[in-house]
Amino acid sequence: MATVVNRESVSTGADVIGIVFPVYHGGVPNIVGRFISRMDDINNKYIFGVCTYGDEPGIAMKYLSRTIESRGGKLASGFAVKMPYNYIDFSRSLREVSVEEQQEMFKGWRKKLESIHKSVDARETGRFETSLETLSKMVDTLRLREIVGKRVWLKRAGFVEHTDLTFWECIQLMDSGFQYDEECNGCDICSKVCPVSNIKMIDNRPSWQHRCEQCFACLQWCPKEAIQFGSRTSGGKRYHHPDVKISDMLRRD
């Protein structure tokens, strides 16, 4: 996705399209939204979504559906899969899961995969896995992300300037919370794994350029655990899927 998201248009000859993404802030990552906004000729495609979440899926699938509809398509089904939480800034001790707990989640995913495969193979429609719908809709109706969320998250990230950007636009500024410590050896892995080329190496040290997606790849993949976010991540457990290697992250095809 990162290699094609900046094209003027994206098209495929496939009859079935699957969109797999992590839930960010109860919604769809900006990069996924940009990707879908460039998709053409999807009105006759069977489109399904799979979201992974560490906390709650919320109504991410409803947001995905709206974005797809804006391009003339229709989301047939949307599935949600529980995976380890890896946004380690909040309540670190409450979010970390043991290796054993991770393995149970992976078992759950493999079992879920079977049902997703059957559903897609049968071209089923109308299944949307969500949670906290009433609360999520209230957040939207009362514009709580704009009124409260934007201020809270920017403050936590250390961005103190006034901005008229929307909450979702402000995510790119939340990289203000990233910094490196004395363990940094200038290996450049952080800049290489960033899916949007948001990290520039200056004097052999990372500098974030305010195009952030908040995926935390830089923090999670740093071999020295030298990248921190705010003041609460030092010493915190890092996580990425054990079957994913750094070579996978560096491949952009």
Tell where the protein language model's regions lie, with residue ranges.
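FMN-binding flavodoxin-like domain, especially the glycine-rich phosphate-binding loop
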Residues: 1-8, 12-21, 25-165, 232-237, ...
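Short low-complexity, flexible loop/linker segments enriched in glycine and/or proline
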Residues: 91-93, 212-215, 242-247
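Iron-sulfur cluster-binding cysteine motifs and their immediate structural context
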Residues: 179-180, 185-213, 217-235
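Generic structural signal for beta-strand residues in well-ordered domains
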Residues: 9-11, 40, 171, 187, ...
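Acidic, Ser/Thr-rich low-complexity intrinsically disordered segments
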Residues: 143-196
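A short, structure-level motif marking secondary-structure boundaries and short turns
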Residues: 48-50, 175-176, 203
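A generic secondary-structure micro-motif detector
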Residues: 53-54, 170, 208
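Residue-level preference for short coil/turn positions at secondary-structure junctions
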Residues: 12-14, 43-44, 174, 180, ...
